[in-house]
């Protein structure tokens, strides 16, 4: 299994008025192989989302290194790409899933999934066709023309997953993806992500405070005191 992504010694502190900087990440190390599903658990405020933002190039670490397919992405205190190049990298190589779906309320499920590709290419019909295939794969073939308000919470999150997969990313970063779902839909969501990681050879890094479903992942890490440690999740 080839290594897709590796972060070494990631540090991050935030300045506080009149006080010393508050360290959030203390030399955190993380790797993900191709097609591997990694879950990061930990208490709220432990730095899980901060780390995910660093991995997704949405924020800048204070120190450490990030490698993608063996090539340095962040090293020696700076990203190795311009802001424009980083945005292109994110759009092409990384998919994002958030606790809040951020679906466009005036657009159908199919249009929400197709939107980013349409904006990038200017070709609507091919984007809609690919979106329809993805939604069908995720069990939503009968919901293509439904607005977000007409979908259940679980269906909305599956639309968000389809949107994240639209650019055929190598890596998907998910921040509390089941936070607004009941236990039954949360279980289905994690089962779906586990299946997708194997079928598509897509790596998933999932952040959650809920240990119940972490056992479905290939590897579980616990965020504690700004560092990541192997953990044994609840079964």
From Swiss-Prot:
ATP binds at residues 42-49. The keyword Translocase applies. Residues 5-234 form the ABC transporter domain. It is an enzyme of class 7 (translocase). Pfam families: ABC_tran (PF00005). GO terms for molecular function: ATP binding; ATP hydrolysis activity; transmembrane transporter activity. Belongs to the ABC transporter superfamily. Lipoprotein translocase (TC 3.A.1.125) family. Part of the ABC transporter complex LolCDE involved in the translocation of mature outer membrane-directed lipoproteins, from the inner membrane to the periplasmic chaperone, LolA. Responsible for the formation of the LolA-lipoprotein complex in an ATP-dependent manner. This is Lipoprotein-releasing system ATP-binding protein LolD 1. It comes from Chlorobium luteolum (strain DSM 273 / BCRC 81028 / 2530).
């Amino acid at each position: 299994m080839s290594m897709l992504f590796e972060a070494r010694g990631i540090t991050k502190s935030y300045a506080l008025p009149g006080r010393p900087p508050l360290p959030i990440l203390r030399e955190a190390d993380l790797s993900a192989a191709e097609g591997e599903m990694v879950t990061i658990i930990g208490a709220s405020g432990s730095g899980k989302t901060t780390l995910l933002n660093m991995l997704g190039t949405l924020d800048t670490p204070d120190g450490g290194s990030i490698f993608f397919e063996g090539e340095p992405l962040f090293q020696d205190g700076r990203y190795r790409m311009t802001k424009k190049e980083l945005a292109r990298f994110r759009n092409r190589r990384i998919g994002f899933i958030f606790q809040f779906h951020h679906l466009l309320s005036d657009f159908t499920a199919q249009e929400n999934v197709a939107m980013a590709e349409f904006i990038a290419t200017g070709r609507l019909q091919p984007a809609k066709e690919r979106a329809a295939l993805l939604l069908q794969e995720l069990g939503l073939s009968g919901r293509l023309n439904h607005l977000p308000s007409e979908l259940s919470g679980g269906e909305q999150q599956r639309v968000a997953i389809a949107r994240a997969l639209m650019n055929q990313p190598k890596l998907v970063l998910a921040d509390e993806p089941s936070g607004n779902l009941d236990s039954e839909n949360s279980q289905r969501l994690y089962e779906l992500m586990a299946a997708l990681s194997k079928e598509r050879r897509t790596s998933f890094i999932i952040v959650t405070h809920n240990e119940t479903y972490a056992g479905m992942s290939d590897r579980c890490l616990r965020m504690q005191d700004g560092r990541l440690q192997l953990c044994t999740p609840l079964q």
